[in-house]
């Protein structure tokens, strides 16, 4: 407990309450405060001006981050014929159809993203009770049900993140790791915000971007000055 208390004191001494941090300063400070033995993720929380109780104001989609997240992503693709070959060439880790469905039903789920060609949904649809709770069910809204499986694989491997408003109207995403170049984190956040802007519900009124917060896996959250971002 002594170490934890010492770290908490150090954090309190470094952070200014109520301050809006330029994104560059926030990234540098989060890296300075990181004191764990593993490589922490850098995460962003974006408070949106939506009413999550209304179905037409739920914001959901995907964004390809220009500098990726730093994580290795294993991709499974449900496709057959030429589409299966395209998926393999694009770098998919697992490609199959009925055989892949049998693996999933048998509990063999060693992947992070599932992509399906539209014709494969008759097979994938039966796996909803298995894939759904794990957040792996393909969905056209986030680009994981698509005829262009090759591009979807490249997106997933290249740092695509999926987002969805929670009950508080907040989007949570990983935008890199401690040790990333400051500008890379900034550009990843800006890419996400640009896509969120495109996804703004027409029924959402008032200020859409209410607050942006950067944090690390085990670190504090720092409120970001919107003037330091292209929004």
UniProtKB/Swiss-Prot annotation:
GO terms for molecular function: rRNA binding; structural constituent of ribosome; tRNA binding. Keywords: Repressor, Ribonucleoprotein, Ribosomal protein, RNA-binding, rRNA-binding, Translation regulation, tRNA-binding. GO terms for biological process: regulation of translation; translation. GO terms for cellular component: cytosolic large ribosomal subunit. This is Large ribosomal subunit protein uL1. Part of the 50S ribosomal subunit. Binds directly to 23S rRNA. The L1 stalk is quite mobile in the ribosome, and is involved in E site tRNA release. Protein L1 is also a translational repressor protein, it controls the translation of the L11 operon by binding to its mRNA. It comes from the Bacteria. InterPro entries: Ribosom_uL1_bac-type, Ribosomal_uL1, Ribosomal_uL1-like, Ribosomal_uL1/biogenesis, Ribosomal_uL1_3-a/b-sand, Ribosomal_uL1_CS. Belongs to the universal ribosomal protein uL1 family. NCBIfam families: rplA_bact (TIGR01169). The gene is rplA.
